């Protein structure tokens, strides 16, 4: 099974992957984020935050208040299944989570919680059959 996925982000606030299906035989799953743009993280930083789809907007809103030093993720937010750090152009980061944290039939979303990005920079994640 392919127990990882790579998502590229750019200076135009886009992810190149809109859907990730996690093979249910995977015990752990790794999400790799690459910033293929040129801009610095203070201006055009991106991260990858995984939550239930229903929690996406609230987590993004709370994350804005956390600031760049906290990677725009509220400390101790139990709605966050996994997240990368905020990266700038030419950088990359990865995060691994236990597949037991996601359930079949539930809709999950991954998004960038950098202020103003989440509405455009998002995708769906689900457990495969």
UniProtKB/Swiss-Prot annotation:
It is found in: Periplasm. Signal peptide: none annotated. Transfers electrons from cytochrome c551 to cytochrome oxidase. InterPro entries: Azurin (IPR014068), BlueCu_1 (IPR000923), BlueCu_1_BS (IPR028871), Cu-binding_ET (IPR050845), Cupredoxin (IPR008972). CDD domains: Azurin. The keyword Nucleus does not apply. It comes from the Bacteria. SUPFAM superfamilies: Cupredoxins. This is Azurin-2. Keywords: Copper, Disulfide bond, Electron transport, Metal-binding, Periplasm, Transport. Cu cation binds at residues 46, 112, 117, 121. Its main location: periplasm. One of its GO terms (molecular function) is electron transfer activity. GO terms for cellular component: periplasmic space. Pfam families: Copper-bind (PF00127). Disulfide bonds join 3-26. Residues 1-129 form the Plastocyanin-like domain.
């Amino acid at each position: 099974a392919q127990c990882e996925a790579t998502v590229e982000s750019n200076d135009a606030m886009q992810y190149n992957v809109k859907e990730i299906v996690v093979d249910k035989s995977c015990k752990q799953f790794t999400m790799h984020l690459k910033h293929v743009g040129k801009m610095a993280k203070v201006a055009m930083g991106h991260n990858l935050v995984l939550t239930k789809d229903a929690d996406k907007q609230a987590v993004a809103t709370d994350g804005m208040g956390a600031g760049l030093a906290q990677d725009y993720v509220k400390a101790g937010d139990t709605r966050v299944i996994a997240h990368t750090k905020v990266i700038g152009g030419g950088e990359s980061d990865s995060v691994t989570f236990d597949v037991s944290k996601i359930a079949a039939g539930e809709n999950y979303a991954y998004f960038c919680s950098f202020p103003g990005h989440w509405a455009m920079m998002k995708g769906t994640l689900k457990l495969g059959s």
